[in-house]
């Protein structure tokens, strides 16, 4: 038994979609979450800067005595995950491979779409992972740089959000049967995305898929938390305004949480 927390990092609030699923599946595990909303979005930034910011988040989590780090950010996974994983002596998990694997299982026509930040799409990481496992699957990738700012400003239900999502996704409509939400912010726009793509297109939440892998690693390294612990205290940190973060988090997690400000 290991009662240390699991650390989550993201460029902002998007990684809460992963946390929500973890709380549902593994309610006995403690969580420490750091969201770098002050510098979001990461997607348009240079690779060197993204790597630098990611390491700052990693080092912060290490000060919290975490037993595992989850990259709840596709951009950080694409740019820095392999380097961080090789450097640390605790498990480090990314969201890309679980999402790619789920897309392969889901597609019936071999036509998969991937939406993500400019950096995630430019890295071509999803297409590489998908076609490594299933060479016959066709992958169409599309950068959606306007989605993260919508979520970070809590405008997910606005008419502006609906127009931006419709305009952004139009190149994929009618051409795919499975769509990977290749940014953990995007599930917060899921109803609008589903409406635009149509009911026949299966949406893959890469973050939620990653929770299954978290469970596997906890078992493999024998670092599960206390299954009998009912009152688990989580900690949430943001580099931006805690009140805005708290408002979005409370809606998504369906519980009121305390958010602390941190300067990196």
From Swiss-Prot:
Q: In which pathway does it act?
A: Cell wall biogenesis; peptidoglycan biosynthesis
In the record, biological process GO terms are:
cell wall organization; peptidoglycan biosynthetic process; regulation of cell shape
Q: What class of enzyme is it?
A: isomerase
An annotated Gene Ontology molecular function: glutamate racemase activity
Give binding positions for substrate: 10-11, 42-43, 74-75, 184-185
| Keywords for the protein's UniProt record, in alphabetical order | Cell shape, Cell wall biogenesis/degradation, Isomerase, Peptidoglycan synthesis
Looking at the Swiss-Prot or TrEMBL record, what is one Pfam family this protein matches?
Asp_Glu_race
The active site annotation covers: 73, 183
Protein's job: Provides the (R)-glutamate required for cell wall biosynthesis.
Task: Indicate what this protein is called per its UniProt record.
Answer: Glutamate racemase
The record lists the organism as Streptococcus pyogenes serotype M28 (strain MGAS6180)
Provide the gene name from the record: murI
